[in-house]
Structure formats: structure tokens, C-alpha cells
């Protein structure tokens, strides 16, 4: 009579269910318990040079901030004429506009329905209003101490780098917030320049380097990757050269930062990928594959 339950236990096949009573102890583990275990089935295999290429977006934005600060310092010290900066920026914007339109082939213009004349009018309206409000921008923060202005500018530029759209699908990404923080930093720094003309040109330059330049970067990266790499290298060396003219120590530290982001970080990412171990099985939460947007409208 005592051996009968044991025989039944061997004959009954264990099932992975909780709604049936089974002749097994609560801590029983069957051989088939982990037969559906899968590891790293959705893991992406990264290649070193591909990661280096993607890191160039971060390099570009760091260099943009560096160039902006260097240009501001040159204008504040009286080493750069505002007329020269305005002319150079205007010519660069025109070249970038033509290059963007050439690479894009007019597809973006067709989708948006905008014409070249509409773009020209928008540019003229922006320049006119910015020039008209430049005296206000110059005197906007007169009652605020210079140290506070510099601290605000630093925090705004850091926020710009944090919230910038580097191509990642993350909740923290906000292109609008990133651009607004960069413009706010430019207004803060422009208010400490000698004249209203300096403030006007500084804000205009901020729009060019923080709003227009990233658009051309993305287009070059998507359509002409080799040209994009060349532009990134040229831009990085230009930023380093400008920073070197101000501070050798700062240029060395900035160069180490760029090398770490573009070379060391991808290397460690590839190395750490060997230790990645995500497990998947029947215990995973159910995923709804069907598009439910029609029920939400």
C-alpha cells in the first residue's frame, strides 16, 4: 500500500500548470522546466567601427558647443569683428542650404510644400526681428551678476547636450527643449558682449550652429556617410584648434574627451557585450503585436 503512490508519481507526467493538483511536492523541479529557456534572442550584435560611426553624432554636438563658446570668447575679447562673423555665417548658411537641397533632391520640399521663396522670407523675418530686439537682448540681464549669467549658460549648454536628439528612441530626448536651452544660453552670453550688434550676431550664430547645422549633419549622415565622416573630422579639428588658441590645457582635455567617446566607449561596449545575458521564456509578459491605434482614436 505504501509503494502505490510512488508508482503513480512516476507514471504521471508533470505539467507546468498551477490550476491542477499534481502528485509532486511544491518544490519539485522537472527536467523539462527550462527546456523553453532562450538567451539573448533579441540581442543586437554591435560592430566596433559601426559604433564609432554612430558616436560621431555626439562628437559633432560637443564640437558645436565648443565652437560656439570659442566664438563668443573671441568677440568678448574684441579679437573677432561681428561683421566678419555675420558675413561668414551668412555665406555658410547659403552654402549649407544649397548643399542640403542638392543632397535631398527636393524631396523634403515636396513633402512640406514649402518653396525657396518661403524659406527666404522666413530668414529675412528672423533676421529683422532679431536685429530689432537686439537692444532688448543686450539689456535683458543687466541686473543679473556676471557669475550667475555664466553659471546659467553652462547649465543650459549641458542641458542642451543631454536632451539633444542623437538618434536614440528614449523618453529623455526632446529636440525642442534642447534647442531652447541652447538659445537661452546664447542670450545669456550675448548680454555680456560690448554692443547690441554683437548680441544680434551672437544669437544669429547660435541659430545657425544649433538649429541649422544639425539638420545638415543628419542629411549627410543618411545620404553620404563618407562625406559625413570627413566633415566630422574637419569640424573636430577646427574646434580643437580654436580651443587651443585660448587654452592648451582645455584643448588637451577636450581632445581626450573626444577620443574617449569615439574610441574607448565603443571598445568597452563591444567588450561588455560578451557578458550580456538576457533570458526569455514562457514567464515573460505578454506582448500585444496587433496595432490598437484604431481603438484609441
UniProtKB/Swiss-Prot annotation:
Pathway(s) this gene product operates in, as recorded in its UniProt entry: Glycolipid biosynthesis; glycosylphosphatidylinositol-anchor biosynthesis
Keywords: Endoplasmic reticulum, GPI-anchor biosynthesis, Membrane, Transmembrane, Transmembrane helix
Compartments where found: Endoplasmic reticulum membrane
Transmembrane annotation, as ranges: 67-87, 88-108, 153-173, 239-259
Function statement: Part of the glycosylphosphatidylinositol-N-acetylglucosaminyltransferase (GPI-GnT) complex that catalyzes the transfer of N-acetylglucosamine from UDP-N-acetylglucosamine to phosphatidylinositol and participates in the first step of GPI biosynthesis.
Oligomer status and interactors: Component of the glycosylphosphatidylinositol-N-acetylglucosaminyltransferase (GPI-GnT) complex composed at least by PIGA, PIGC, PIGH, PIGP, PIGQ, PIGY and DPM2. Interacts with PIGQ. Interacts with the heterodimer PIGA:PIGH.
Assigned protein family: Belongs to the PIGC family.
Protein name stated in the entry: Phosphatidylinositol N-acetylglucosaminyltransferase subunit C
Organism: Bos taurus (Bovine)
Amino acid at each position: 500500500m505504501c509503494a502505490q503512490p510512488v508508482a503513480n508519481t512516476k507514471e504521471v507526467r508533470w505539467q507546468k500548470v498551477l490550476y491542477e493538483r499534481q502528485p509532486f511536492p511544491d518544490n519539485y523541479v522537472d527536467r523539462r522546466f527550462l527546456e523553453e529557456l532562450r538567451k539573448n534572442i533579441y540581442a543586437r550584435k554591435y560592430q566596433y567601427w559601426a559604433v564609432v560611426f554612430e558616436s560621431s553624432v555626439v562628437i559633432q554636438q560637443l564640437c558645436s558647443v565648443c565652437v560656439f563658446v570659442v566664438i563668443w570668447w573671441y568677440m568678448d575679447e574684441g579679437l573677432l569683428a561681428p561683421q566678419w562673423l555675420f558675413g561668414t555665417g551668412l555665406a555658410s548658411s547659403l552654402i549649407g542650404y544649397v548643399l542640403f537641397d542638392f543632397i535631398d533632391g527636393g524631396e523634403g520640399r515636396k513633402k512640406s510644400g514649402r518653396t525657396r521663396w518661403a524659406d527666404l522670407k522666413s530668414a529675412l523675418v528672423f533676421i529683422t526681428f532679431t536685429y530689432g530686439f537686439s537692444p532688448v537682448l543686450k539689456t535683458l540681464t543687466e541686473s543679473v551678476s556676471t557669475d550667475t549669467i555664466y553659471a546659467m549658460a553652462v547649465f543650459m549648454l549641458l542641458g542642451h547636450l543631454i536632451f539633444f536628439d542623437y538618434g536614440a528612441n528614449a523618453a529623455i530626448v526632446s529636440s525642442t527643449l534642447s534647442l531652447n536651452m541652447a538659445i537661452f544660453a546664447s542670450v545669456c552670453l550675448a548680454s555680456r558682449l560690448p554692443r547690441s550688434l554683437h548680441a544680434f550676431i551672437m544669437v544669429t550664430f547660435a541659430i545657425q550652429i544649433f538649429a541649422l547645422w544639425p539638420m545638415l549633419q543628419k542629411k549627410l549622415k543618411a545620404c553620404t556617410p563618407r562625406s559625413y565622416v570627413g566633415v566630422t573630422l574637419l569640424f573636430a579639428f577646427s574646434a580643437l584648434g580654436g580651443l587651443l588658441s585660448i587654452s592648451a590645457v582645455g584643448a588637451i582635455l577636450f581632445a581626450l574627451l573626444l577620443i574617449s567617446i569615439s574610441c574607448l566607449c565603443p571598445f568597452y561596449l563591444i567588450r561588455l557585450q560578451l557578458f550580456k545575458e538576457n533570458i526569455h521564456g514562457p514567464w515573460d509578459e505578454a506582448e500585444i503585436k496587433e496595432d490598437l491605434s484604431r481603438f484609441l482614436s
